[in-house]
């Protein structure tokens, strides 16, 4: 993350769940993603805002 990228507020993790499984998410700071191990999906964080759309999620390998 550089100085022009807004930081993700980790307190948001307390309120957010996976939109597919309704399970907890993990924050991957390096990839700027919220990861759902239950759904095997990674949701992008853009400009500090999580994009919780399944169409925008990346499948985990």
Swiss-Prot record:
Superkingdom to which the source organism belongs = Bacteria
- State a single Pfam family of this protein: Trm112p
Q: Which GO terms describe its cellular component?
A: cytosol
| InterPro entries hit by this protein | Trm112-like
Family, as annotated: Belongs to the UPF0434 family.
Q: What is this protein called?
A: UPF0434 protein TM1040_0056
Supply the source organism for this entry.
Ruegeria sp. (strain TM1040) (Silicibacter sp.)
């Amino acid at each position: 993350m550089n100085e022009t990228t807004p930081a993700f507020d980790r307190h948001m993790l307390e309120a957010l769940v996976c939109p597919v499984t309704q399970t907890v998410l993990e924050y991957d700071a390096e990839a700027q993603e919220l990861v759902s191990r239950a759904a095997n999906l990674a949701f992008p964080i853009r400009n500090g805002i999580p994009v919780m759309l399944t169409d925008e999620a990346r499948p985990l390998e």
